Amino acid sequence: MEHPEQKLQEKLRKFLASRLKPEIVWMASANGGYRDPHTAVSLKSMGVLPGAPDLCFCLDNGRTGWIELKAPGGRLSPQQKGVAARLIRLNHFWGVAHSIKEAVDIMRPWNVFKDGADLNEPREIEETEA
């Protein structure tokens, strides 16, 4: 079974590896994908939040930036919409991206990229991975 959102996340990780400032801390959430009921209950008991965005970036201004990755045509679940509204209300950054380019556009105002980083190369990864 193909997982387009997982593939997008892997491509984005590769793209960001050489472009983010070294002091930026970022991580992926444990959400996403199908889980058997036992695993889902276990993860929830450990604090995994249904609807949490896929990626979190700790920014130099004390705020966080969050990105929900979606396959082309993918839509937000009600839980994802609820978490997004809460994050925005708490004055954090949040966005949904269907491509590397959209993720980069969301992240530009966050001041996370190295000076001079080439952000116009998203196709390089998409083409080499195709």
What is each model feature region?
Residues 1-130:
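Catalytic phosphate/metal-binding cores of nucleic-acid and nucleotide-processing enzymes, i.e., regions
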